[in-house]
Swiss-Prot record:
GO terms for cellular component: nucleus. It is found in: Nucleus. Residues 18-44 bind DNA. It comes from Saccharomyces cerevisiae (strain ATCC 204508 / S288c). The keyword Cytoplasm does not apply. Keywords: DNA-binding, Metal-binding, Nucleus, Transcription, Transcription regulation, Zinc. GO terms for molecular function: DNA-binding transcription factor activity, RNA polymerase II-specific; sequence-specific DNA binding; zinc ion binding. GO terms for biological process: DNA-templated transcription; positive regulation of transcription by RNA polymerase II. Disruption phenotype: Confers sensitivity to calcofluor white, and prevents growth on non-fermentable carbon sources such as glycerol or lactate. Sensitizes cells to oxidative stress. Leads to a decrease in peroxisome abundance when oleate was used as a sole carbon source. The gene is TOG1. Zn(2+) 1 binds at C18, C21, C28, C34. Transcriptional activator required for growth on non-fermentable carbon sources and that regulates genes involved in fatty acid utilization. Acts as a direct activator that binds the promoters of oleate utilizing genes, encoded key enzymes in beta-oxidation and NADPH regeneration (POX1, FOX2,POT1 and IDP2), the glyoxylate shunt (MLS1 and ICL1), and gluconeogenesis (PCK1 and FBP1). Also regulates the abundance of peroxisomes that are vital for fatty acid oxidation. This is Transcription factor TOG1. Zn(2+) 2 binds at C18, C34, C37, C44. PROSITE patterns: ZN2_CY6_FUNGAL_1 (PS00463), ZN2_CY6_FUNGAL_2 (PS50048).
Length: 794
């Protein structure tokens, strides 16, 4: 009997369980079902699960929760017993006390047990033990507190990263959804392509990276050079176009004897180079390869002298101006880790210079003060932008910031003391003052991102570890209600923007700067709503069933708004019909395409062919960009070209997923789909055909990737350990299906056989394996997060 004290009460048998459950003589947890149960839509539970132990890391000196309940009950009774003659102010005061008591979060007042913490000698981190298994999710996909294999929140995939879909938990979620809808050959081919994409993209980062070595060392390794730094700089300068250097206005006072001089010269070269991508001048064909080669040369020069300037010009604001200019031209090209180094320097230097405080402006002449105000709000914006694209907390503390808006912005009827609602309501947008309105737009966007990140995503009242470590779920009901209040405020802010600011931006979107601001607003909405969804799911997971259901409508609304915002921004980007402008939007397009794909996966019957046409038109545009450059597969080592190539490949895979989900939900043949897509243009139909053809050239590049990668090694290791001789490391070639493959304009599939290396045996073995669901269960945690009681394939 003693052995059974720690066991949970067994639940009744389920009426339907999958073969895998019967074979292994287990029942699967409804929160962690196997693929078979997903496919049969069964809900099973494990038997003999151990109860969670009460946490031993906290000092429970008393039950604050019970004390609060007693106090609220006493006040409620007192209020009910008041005579009719009692003053109204007394009744109101008692009601206010009850309201304030509701806001108190007992968990936040728990203290750690110092003896337990100091004597802890376990293998897992203290944080892991404190949380235990009370909390099951950090976001829509992850199961971080049940994983025994890896750290789910990494330096790259932050807590609120918009690219969480590409983490292993996100891919696991997508894979299970696809398998639950269909386990046919085409679905398995899609899964294989996704796995191979991750493998190939991991392998592409095996070479030298600008994030891990000095700029000149990076340049020398890429070009196979072995010489001193001065010679390398001369080599870079000699390869920069004379046209770019000739168009750069050099201040005659610059003697180029300081690192700052060289850095600012590099910034001016970058400004001239990027003028070639101006929408008005882009009609003149600029070869992609040439642009990227020149861009990397100039940026390498800038980074080298940026590093040399770090300790030689501690209080020189000249470099700060150069860094702001560099961010404006490079934010859509570089890896976030590279940009993070620049932005962290900008943020620290702007604070050290006192640009964030009004006290430092006293005694300055107005022209200098105005220049510094503009500089400050630029630095503030890029700090918030970085938080948006990485999901990480900002560096600049908003509560310690007090700086006036630039004079021209104040002239629009606003000032720095106003909140987001007031700014939107009072601003007087003037089409004759585009530049000023754009400046206001970035300031407003900065304040909105601050409200979301400081007020919600990194607010201790919603994210403190104590909230997720204590088993008393009823104490979280008040937290959940307050979270909904804050969420409603953010929704209203974005609705106000949609009603007033977005129509203005769309009306004048022919102005490239206006449209750039519009895309920032659209992407910010997507990221903010994704982050809020993750936070709500984290809280929702700890509530009782009734309270959980109350949050379902909120989660549904978030996903709908995220999807609609993604469709809007993709539609408007495509309206420009400017290949190079679409090229510049690549920094956020992949996340947008993934959002649309998730909607196709979850609710395929609700999706229109017009959404699918957007996906096809976008991948056709990226394909045209590479074709116009003369080569789909770049042979060089340019970092951005690799990122663009990988992004285009995954865009084709995502479009393939959407096409498959749509044809199945509509019970439509592929030929009928192509006819429907043809209504949106021949290129749209061609792109759809290419996406569904396993021999498409973009898939050939993925399948033909033979480089070793950590991803491949990890998967093979798990398969070898768990599957034995079912899967082995032999190199098996496979013939690509070559049956009268259609030839599309510009998107022709490969007509040659495809050789597949030592990963998952081969494409043919992978798609014909009888145990694919079991195989996939082995190397990813089974996670199923989302709306309560959702219907698969609805």
């Amino acid at each position: 009997m003693a052995a059974k004290r720690g066991l949970a009460k067994q639940k009744s048998r389920v009426t339907k369980a999958c073969d895998r459950c019967h074979r292994k003589k287990i029942k699967c947890n409804s929160k962690k079902p196997c693929f078979g149960c997903i496919g049969s839509q069964s809900k099973c539970t494990y038997r003999n699960q151990f109860r969670e132990p009460i946490e031993a890391f906290f000092n429970y000196t008393g039950s604050l929760s019970n004390d609060l309940d007693n106090a609220k009950c006493s006040i409620a009774k007192l209020k009910a017993q008041l005579p009719p003659s009692a003053p109204a102010s007394l009744q109101k005061g008692l009601a206010n006390i009850c309201t304030e008591l509701e806001k108190i979060q007992p968990q936040l007042y728990l203290n750690l047990d110092s003896k337990e913490i100091s004597s802890y000698g376990g293998l897992k981190s203290i944080e892991t033990e404190i949380i235990g298994k009370q909390s099951k999710s950090l976001n829509r996909f992850s199961n971080a507190f049940e994983s025994n294999t890896a750290q789910n929140v990494s330096m790259y995939f932050g807590v609120y990263s918009p690219l969480l879909y590409f983490a292993s938990t996100g891919i696991s979620w997508i894979t299970k959804k696809l398998i639950s809808c269909s386990n046919d050959r085409e679905t398995r081919e899609t899964i294989y392509l996704f796995l191979k994409f991750l493998d190939a993209s991991s392998a592409s980062h095996a070479g030298p990276k600008v994030t891990s070595i000095s700029p000149l060392e990076y340049y020398s390794k890429l070009n196979g050079l072995s010489c001193g730094n001065d010679v390398l700089i001369q080599h870079i300068m000699s390869n920069i176009s004379n046209e770019i250097k000739g168009n750069t206005n050099i201040n005659q006072t610059i003697k180029f004897n300081k690192p700052t001089d060289w850095f600012m010269y590099g910034v001016q070269l970058m400004e001239q180079h990027h003028k070639a991508l101006d929408r008005k001048s882009s009609k003149k064909l600029l070869p992609l390869k040439y642009f990227l080669e020149q861009d990397e040369l100039i940026f390498c020069l800038c980074l080298e002298y940026f590093e040399r300037s770090l300790f030689s010009t501690m209080y020189d604001l000249t470099i700060l101006k150069g860094l702001v200019s560099l961010m404006k031209h490079r934010y859509w090209i570089d890896d976030p880790f590279v940009l993070g180094r620049i932005i962290s320097t900008m943020s620290r230097r702007s604070l050290d210079a006192g640009l964030n405080r009004w006290e430092y402006y006293i005694g300055q002449d107005e022209d200098t003060a105005e220049e510094y105000r503009k500089l400050w709000w630029d630095c503030y914006w890029w700090d918030r932008w970085y938080s948006l694209v990485t999901g990480k907390q900002p560096l600049i503390p908003h509560e310690m910031t007090s700086c006036l808006f630039p004079k021209d912005v104040v002239g629009l009827g606003v000032d720095d003391s106003m909140d987001c609602f007031t700014l939107i309501n009072l601003v007087e947008l003037d089409p004759s003052k585009f530049d000023i309105c754009i400046s206001f737009g970035y300031i407003l966007l900065t304040k909105i991102i601050t409200a979301v990140f400081s007020g919600l995503l990194y607010n201790r009242h919603f994210t403190d570890y104590r909230l997720f470590a204590t088993p008393n779920a009823k104490d979280l009901n008040g937290t959940a209600r307050q979270l909904m209040v804050e969420f409603s405020k953010i929704c209203k802010i974005f609705q106000c923007i949609q009603d007033k600011l977005i129509p203005f931006l769309k009306q004048y979107s022919e102005n490239s700067n206006v449209f750039e601001l519009y895309t920032h607003f659209g992407f910010a909405k997507v990221c903010c709503f994704q982050g809020m969804e993750s936070l709500i799911l984290r809280i929702q997971n700890l509530l009782q069933e009734r309270e959980r259901i109350e949050l379902d409508s909120c989660v549904k609304d978030i996903r709908l708004q995220t999807f609609e915002a993604s469709v809007d921004i993709l539609t408007d980007v495509l309206k420009h019909e400017d290949t190079f402008y679409i090229f510049r939007c690549s920094w956020f397009i992949y996340a947008i395409l993934m959002n649309i794909t998730l909607n196709f996966i979850e609710t395929p019957r609700r999706n229109s062919i017009c959404y699918l046409s957007l996906m096809c038109r976008m991948i056709a545009s990226y394909n045209d960009l590479f074709v116009s450059s003369g080569n789909v597969n770049f042979k060089g080592n340019n970092a951005f070209s690799k990122k663009l190539e990988n992004g285009t490949a995954v865009s084709f895979i995502l479009t393939r997923i959407c096409c498959q989900m749509y044809t199945r939900s509509q019970k439509m043949a592929k030929e009928s789909l192509f006819c429907e897509l043809k209504k949106y243009g021949q290129a749209c139909s061609d792109a759809g055909q290419a996406a569904l053809d396993i021999e498409c050239i973009w898939y050939r590049n993925i399948i033909g990737e033979h480089k070793e990668s950590s991803f491949r090694k990890e998967i093979l290791s798990i398969l070898d350990r768990e599957m034995g001789d079912l899967v082995n490391n032999r190199v098996i070639g496979v013939q690509g299906k070559n049956q009268e493959g259609a030839c599309y304009e510009k998107l022709s599939p490969s007509s040659t056989s495809v050789s597949v290396g030592m990963d998952f045996c081969s494409l043919e073995n992978f798609v014909t394996a009888e145990s694919l669901p079991d195989l996939l269960n082995l190397f990813w945690e089974d996670t199923e997060f989302g709306i309560t009681k959702e219907n698969l394939g609805e």
